[in-house]
């Protein structure tokens, strides 16, 4: 998970920098296979401007659902671009590593699925029209390369917005050194299979703020049941925070998840197995008042035994 550690460093640096923006793009994807399967594509990006002509971005990319593949991933790209005007066009090219998650099949049927992970490259070209405000319109052509199953090409369009600076006093109200936070959470968990089975998930989270940009958490989590199978455990994560508005904080976490997992979906008395897996999360927290917080997180559990899952949790908690 070298990429995720590099993103931690990137976001730590960006928390004290100025020109940053977020974007949401959507469009079409074509898999570079003989069948030429097509599907949708979505990109959520966060960009840090390093220089007049250079930027670096962190991207979540969903490559859609071509036949026998549900693939998404995380990419980091270094961009070279023309000067960015207050209003008008800029053009750029980006390249970097891409860590993918692919729900695929071992025998050519939807009943047998596998969760494959690995490294590839992500490369992009874009054209951006900067509006008079902080908003902009973007068209992007992206290509994933070096992945065993297939490469893919995506054409997407969407909007972006430059993030303004938040005064330090406001940042400290959202998260200050020594703060403690207890959250009660509930939501849905989704098995990364072709059926995408869902169940009700719950969590109890404790957080400790080390700096206004770094937190640590321990989460007791129950991912619920799929038929007779059930998984629950405890995760510990380190979080990086970036103020988005005066009351809202964006966050990214990475850590380990120790769990007890029952894999047999037909026998409720089947033996449970113990596993430890990486877990990566992104989220947003809202400061309701001096003590109460609301939070939404999405976590990806990354296993080595074909049992990846997405866990979405929404809740509220008390800061003290």
Can you describe what each PLM-predicted range is?
Residues 13-19:
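Sec/Tat signal peptide C-region and signal peptidase I cleavage site
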Residues 21, 28, 152-188, 308-320:
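Outer-membrane beta-barrel "beta-signal"
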Residues 21-23, 52-58, 86-91, 129-139, ...:
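Repeated loop/turn-to-beta-strand initiation elements of outer-membrane beta-barrel proteins
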Residues 28-32, 60-66, 80-82, 95-103, ...:
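Transmembrane beta-strands of outer-membrane beta-barrel pores
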Residues 36-42, 70-76, 117-123, 151-155, ...:
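Residues that define the transmembrane beta-barrel architecture of outer-membrane proteins
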Residues 44-48, 76-82, 95-97, 125-129, ...:
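Residues on the lipid-exposed face of transmembrane beta-strands in outer-membrane beta-barrel proteins
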Residues 58-70, 101-119, 218-234, 260-274:
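Flexible, solvent-exposed loop segments that connect beta-strands
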Residues 73-80, 88, 161-164, 171-257:
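Detector for outer-membrane/organellar transmembrane beta-barrel domains
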């Amino acid at each position: 998970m070298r990429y995720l550690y590099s993103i931690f460093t990137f976001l730590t640096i960006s928390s004290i920098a100025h020109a940053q923006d977020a974007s949401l793009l959507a469009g079409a994807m074509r898999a570079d296979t003989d069948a030429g399967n097509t599907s949708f594509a979505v990109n959520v990006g966060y960009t840090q401007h390093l220089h007049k002509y250079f930027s670096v971005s962190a991207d979540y990319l969903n490559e859609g659902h071509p036949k026998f593949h549900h693939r998404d991933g995380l990419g980091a790209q270094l961009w070279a671009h023309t000067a960015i005007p207050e209003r008008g066009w800029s053009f750029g090219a980006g390249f970097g590593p891409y860590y993918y998650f692919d729900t695929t099949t071992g025998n050519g049927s939807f009943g047998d699925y596998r969760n494959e992970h690995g490294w590839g490259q992500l490369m992009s070209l874009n054209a951006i029209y900067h509006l008079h405000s902080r908003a902009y319109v973007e068209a992007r052509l992206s290509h994933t390369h070096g992945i065993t199953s297939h490469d893919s090409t995506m054409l997407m369009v969407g909007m972006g917005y430059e993030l303004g600076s938040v005064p330090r006093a406001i940042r400290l109200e959202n998260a200050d050194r020594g703060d403690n936070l207890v959250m009660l959470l509930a939501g849905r968990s989704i098995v990364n299979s072709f059926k995408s089975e869902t169940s009700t998930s719950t969590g109890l989270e404790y957080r400790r703020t080390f700096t206004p940009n770094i937190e640590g958490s321990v989460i007791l989590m129950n991912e619920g049941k799929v038929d007779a199978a059930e998984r629950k455990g405890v995760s510990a994560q380190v979080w990086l925070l970036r103020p988005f508005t005066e009351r809202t904080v964006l966050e990214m976490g990475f850590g380990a998840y120790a769990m007890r997992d029952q894999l047999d979906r037909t026998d409720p008395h089947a033996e449970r197995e113990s596993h430890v897996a990486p877990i990566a999360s992104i989220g947003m927290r809202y400061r309701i008042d001096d003590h109460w917080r609301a939070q939404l997180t999405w976590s990806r559990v990354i296993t080595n035994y074909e049992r990846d899952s997405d866990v979405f949790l929404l809740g509220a908690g008390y800061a003290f």
